[in-house]
């Protein structure tokens, strides 16, 4: 039995464990393991805290992004509505401008037409007066002719103008 190497290894192991127990190596090992466990637990707690902060930041970013998207959509809708309003207003102004210009042109045309009719009537009256004067001066002579001519000319002018 003492000749077996396994026996001496077992005896050496038991003696070594006894020395370790006497010196208090197990307490040192346990203390070191406890410190290491506490450090790892602290690191895990820090990692959990950082993960929670990152999740909060991500949620905040997503909320801000959604808010910015809504605001951008509102701005776009407002700009479209404003553009449509301006276009409608410009169309109304253009139609009003065209209507006023048309009415003004029609007024000018009517005025020119009335002036042309008046000019033609005046020319016709002058021609009729001249023709009547020529006819009367040839057919009637003397003071009666002058009176008739003056009255007739005035009467024709009054009626034709």
Swiss-Prot record:
One of its GO terms (molecular function) is proton-transporting ATP synthase activity, rotational mechanism. The keyword NAD does not apply. The chain crosses the membrane at residues 5-25. InterPro entries: ATP_synth_b/b'su_bac/chlpt, ATP_synthase_B_chain. It is found in: Cell inner membrane. It holds the Pfam family ATP-synt_B. It is a single-pass membrane protein. Keywords: ATP synthesis, Cell inner membrane, Cell membrane, CF(0), Hydrogen ion transport, Ion transport, Membrane, Transmembrane, Transmembrane helix, Transport. Its main location: membrane. GO terms for cellular component: plasma membrane; proton-transporting ATP synthase complex. Belongs to the ATPase B chain family. HAMAP family: ATP_synth_b_bprime (MF_01398). F(1)F(0) ATP synthase produces ATP from ADP in the presence of a proton or sodium gradient. F-type ATPases consist of two structural domains, F(1) containing the extramembraneous catalytic core and F(0) containing the membrane proton channel, linked together by a central stalk and a peripheral stalk. During catalysis, ATP synthesis in the catalytic domain of F(1) is coupled via a rotary mechanism of the central stalk subunits to proton translocation. Component of the F(0) channel, it forms part of the peripheral stalk, linking F(1) to F(0). F-type ATPases have 2 components, F(1) - the catalytic core - and F(0) - the membrane proton channel. F(1) has five subunits: alpha(3), beta(3), gamma(1), delta(1), epsilon(1). F(0) has three main subunits: a(1), b(2) and c(10-14). The alpha and beta chains form an alternating ring which encloses part of the gamma chain. F(1) is attached to F(0) by a central stalk formed by the gamma and epsilon chains, while a peripheral stalk is formed by the delta and b chains. This is ATP synthase subunit b 1. It comes from Nitrobacter hamburgensis (strain DSM 10229 / NCIMB 13809 / X14).
